[in-house]
Amino acid sequence: MEVILLSKIKKLGDSGAIVHVKSGYARNFLIPKGKAILASKKNIESFEAQRVELEKENISKLLIAQSRAEKIKTIKSITIPSKVGKEGKIFGSIGIRNIIKEMNLLGIKVNKKEIKLPNGVLRQVGEHKVIFQPHNEVCEYFIVNIISKK
């Protein structure tokens, strides 16, 4: 099934590209999520007229994401105190919600989807690398330092 991508999709194509995908992927994911439209003659003509507006919108989203990533760069690390048992293991785990809570205290608003934990939830005391990805093309790393709560 031929579709026109309305936004950049990793490993598929850029905005405005006409790509061939499986019909189930198009009908069940791309089209309902507003990431693509069917590539009929009528849609291709109307999309060409809207292309400039969509490109401006994508550029503005990218600039906003880059400015948010610059804020993250200034922080570099976040410290989260936690109860610790023997051998440096914490009771429970530190997840995305805990990290977002600490970032909100620092005055930085982030969504749950923008934080990625490469090794899963954090269960050890020490420094852990976390990924902040507000946009497909923008990626920034920061450190979460888990310390013992006394």
UniProtKB/Swiss-Prot annotation:
<dbReference type="GO" id="GO:0006412">
    <property type="term" value="P:translation"/>
</dbReference>
<dbReference type="Pfam" id="PF03948">
    <property type="entry name" value="Ribosomal_L9_C"/>
</dbReference>
<comment type="function">
    <text>Binds to the 23S rRNA.</text>
</comment>
<dbReference type="GO" id="GO:0005840">
    <property type="term" value="C:ribosome"/>
</dbReference>
<keyword id="KW-0689">Ribosomal protein</keyword>
<protein>
    <recommendedName>
        <fullName>Large ribosomal subunit protein bL9</fullName>
    </recommendedName>
</protein>
<dbReference type="InterPro" id="IPR020070">
    <property type="entry name" value="Ribosomal_bL9_N"/>
</dbReference>
<keyword id="KW-0687">Ribonucleoprotein</keyword>
<dbReference type="Pfam" id="PF01281">
    <property type="entry name" value="Ribosomal_L9_N"/>
</dbReference>
<dbReference type="InterPro" id="IPR020069">
    <property type="entry name" value="Ribosomal_bL9_C"/>
</dbReference>
<keyword id="KW-0699">rRNA-binding</keyword>
<dbReference type="GO" id="GO:0003735">
    <property type="term" value="F:structural constituent of ribosome"/>
</dbReference>
<dbReference type="GO" id="GO:1990904">
    <property type="term" value="C:ribonucleoprotein complex"/>
</dbReference>
<dbReference type="InterPro" id="IPR009027">
    <property type="entry name" value="Ribosomal_bL9/RNase_H1_N"/>
</dbReference>
<dbReference type="InterPro" id="IPR000244">
    <property type="entry name" value="Ribosomal_bL9"/>
</dbReference>
<keyword id="KW-0694">RNA-binding</keyword>
<comment type="similarity">
    <text>Belongs to the bacterial ribosomal protein bL9 family.</text>
</comment>
<dbReference type="GO" id="GO:0019843">
    <property type="term" value="F:rRNA binding"/>
</dbReference>
<dbReference type="InterPro" id="IPR036791">
    <property type="entry name" value="Ribosomal_bL9_C_sf"/>
</dbReference>
<dbReference type="InterPro" id="IPR020594">
    <property type="entry name" value="Ribosomal_bL9_bac/chp"/>
</dbReference>
<dbReference type="InterPro" id="IPR036935">
    <property type="entry name" value="Ribosomal_bL9_N_sf"/>
</dbReference>
